[in-house]
C-alpha cells in the first residue's frame, strides 16, 4: 500500500510541469499559434527560476522571474510568426535548439564547470487541515506544494473560460477563423500576441517548477522532453482542459512508474525503464493522432488584407 501511495503521490507531482506546459500550448493553439518550442521555453524557465531562487532564496520569485524570462524569449517567436508571418514550425524548432543551449551556457558562466552540484530549498508543502487526514486521497490532493493547488485551479479557470465565457468564445474564434473574427471586431493580432504571452509564461513556469518545487537542482536536460510530451497531451486531451488534465496525469503516472522501477532492484538496464513515458507518448499519438483535428487556423499566418 505504501508503494502504491508513493507512486500516486509522485504521479501528481510529476504531472504538474507537463500540465502547465500543456495549458500553455492550449492557450496558444486556441488562438491559432502552434508553438513547438515548449521544450526550449521550459528550459529557460528552469534555469532562470533556479538562479533566482539560488540568489534570493525565494521560490516564488524564482517562478516569477522564470515566467518573465520565458515571456520575453517567446516574444521573438510572436513577432516572427504574427507580425512577419513566418513559419511556426521553423521558429519553434529553432527555439528548442537555442534555448537549452543558452540555459546551459548561462549556468556554466555563473557557476563555472566544477563538478559540485548546486542546490536550493524547494517550496514546502501546505497541508489543508482536516482534508489531509483522509486515507490515500488526503496526502495525494491536500498535502502538496501551493503550485499544485494553483495549477489545478488554473485547469478549472481554463475550462470555464473557454467553455462558458464570451471572451473565451471570441478567443477560440481567432484560432478557428481569424478573418471572420476580425469582421466581428475581435482584435486578432492582439489575441495572438496575448496567446504568445500566456504560452511563454506558463511553459516557463512549468520548467521553473522542476527546479524550485521538485528537484532542488538544475542539470542540463532537466526538462527531459516534457515539452514534446505536452504537445501530445494537448492532442490526447482533445484541446480541452479536462481532457488535458487526464492526459497529463497519465503521463505523470508513466514517469513516476519508471522512477520506481529503476530502484526496484529488477535486473533490467535502467534505460529501458526511462523509455516508458516516451514510448507511452508514441503509442498514444499512434492511436489517436490521426483522428483528432485542432483549431482550423492552427499554424496559418493571418494577414489583414485577406479579410
Label each PLM-derived region with a short phrase:
Residues 8-11, 40, 60-68, 90, ...:
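Hydrophobic alpha-helical transmembrane segments
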Residues 21-22, 46-50, 100-101, 148-160, ...:
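Hydrophobic core segments of alpha-helical transmembrane domains in multi-pass membrane transport
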Residues 30-34, 73-130, 224-225, 229-242:
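Short loop segments and helix-boundary regions at transmembrane helix junctions
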Amino acid at each position: 500500500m505504501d508503494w502504491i501511495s508513493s507512486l500516486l503521490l509522485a504521479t501528481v507531482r510529476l504531472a504538474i510541469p507537463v500540465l502547465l506546459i500543456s495549458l500553455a500550448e492550449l492557450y496558444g493553439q486556441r488562438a491559432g499559434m502552434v508553438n513547438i518550442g515548449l521544450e526550449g521555453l521550459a528550459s529557460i524557465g528552469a534555469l532562470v527560476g533556479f538562479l533566482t531562487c539560488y540568489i534570493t532564496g525565494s521560490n516564488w520569485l524564482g517562478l516569477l522571474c522564470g515566467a518573465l524570462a520565458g515571456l520575453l524569449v517567446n516574444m521573438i517567436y510572436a513577432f516572427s510568426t504574427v507580425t512577419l508571418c513566418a513559419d511556426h514550425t521553423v521558429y519553434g524548432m529553432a527555439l528548442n535548439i537555442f534555448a537549452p543551449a543558452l540555459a546551459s551556457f548561462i549556468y556554466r558562466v555563473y557557476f563555472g564547470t566544477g563538478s559540485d552540484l548546486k542546490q536550493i530549498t524547494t517550496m514546502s508543502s501546505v497541508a489543508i487541515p482536516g482534508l489531509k487526514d483522509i486515507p490515500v486521497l488526503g496526502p495525494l490532493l491536500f498535502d502538496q506544494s501551493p503550485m499544485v493547488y494553483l495549477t489545478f485551479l488554473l485547469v478549472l479557470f481554463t475550462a470555464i473560460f473557454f467553455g462558458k465565457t464570451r471572451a473565451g468564445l471570441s478567443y477560440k474564434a481567432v484560432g478557428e477563423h481569424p478573418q471572420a473574427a476580425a469582421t466581428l471586431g475581435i482584435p486578432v493580432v492582439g489575441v495572438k500576441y496575448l496567446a504568445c504571452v500566456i504560452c511563454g509564461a506558463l511553459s516557463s513556469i512549468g520548467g521553473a517548477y522542476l527546479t524550485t518545487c521538485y528537484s532542488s537542482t538544475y542539470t542540463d536536460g532537466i526538462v527531459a522532453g516534457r515539452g514534446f510530451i505536452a504537445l501530445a497531451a494537448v492532442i490526447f486531451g482533445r484541446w480541452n482542459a479536462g481532457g488535458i488534465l487526464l492526459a497529463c496525469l497519465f503521463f505523470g503516472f508513466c514517469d513516476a512508474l519508471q522512477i520506481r522501477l529503476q530502484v526496484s532492484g529488477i535486473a533490467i538496464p535502467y534505460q529501458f525503464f526511462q523509455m516508458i513515458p516516451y514510448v507511452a507518448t508514441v503509442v498514444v499519438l499512434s492511436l489517436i493522432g490521426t483522428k483528432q483535428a485542432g483549431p482550423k487556423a492552427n499554424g496559418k499566418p493571418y494577414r489583414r488584407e485577406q479579410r
